[in-house]
UniProtKB/Swiss-Prot annotation:
Pfam families: NifU
Family statement: Belongs to the NifU family.
Keyword vocabulary terms for this entry: Nitrogen fixation
Residue ranges of the region described as Disordered: 1-36
Biased composition (Low complexity): 14-23
Function: May be involved in the formation or repair of [Fe-S] clusters present in iron-sulfur proteins.
Protein name: Nitrogen fixation protein NifU 2
Organism whose genome encodes this protein: Rhodobacter capsulatus
SUPFAM superfamilies in UniProt: Fe-S cluster assembly (FSCA) domain-like
Keyword Electron transport: no
Gene name for this UniProt entry: nifU2
Gene Ontology MF term list: iron ion binding; iron-sulfur cluster binding
Amino acid sequence: MKDLFDESLTLDTGSAAPGTAPGRPRRRQPAGGKAPDTAAFLANFVRIGEIAAPKPPAAADVVSEPEEEAAVVAELIAEMRPMFQRDGGDIELIGLTGATVQVRLSGSCAGCMMSARTLSTVQHQLIETLGRPVRVVPEIRH
């Protein structure tokens, strides 16, 4: 990475030239006396970003049919239920409408202060599994 950032600022602590203030930053000469190649720097910056960016799910992994999607959501929630039940609570799928997954939290989960975080975790798992954004909302009882 050093070659990317060869050019740096230094603080001029010497005597100030007439009309300039001491302590003003000035550019240090890059190694080899050449200016850095901006295009190469930007290309490398983009390449590093592409490597670090998460890849979208492959087309074969994405669920597309609504019936299939509902089955996948129900299965994933069923897999998570034992964790909720171990803590004295439960989660139940109420419905799937478009990008909204409605669930019912019961037992100790219904009044838990961490229920928002729990729903966020369920939502994250569903997004990864379905390959598209969804919102998990609790059932609202009137």
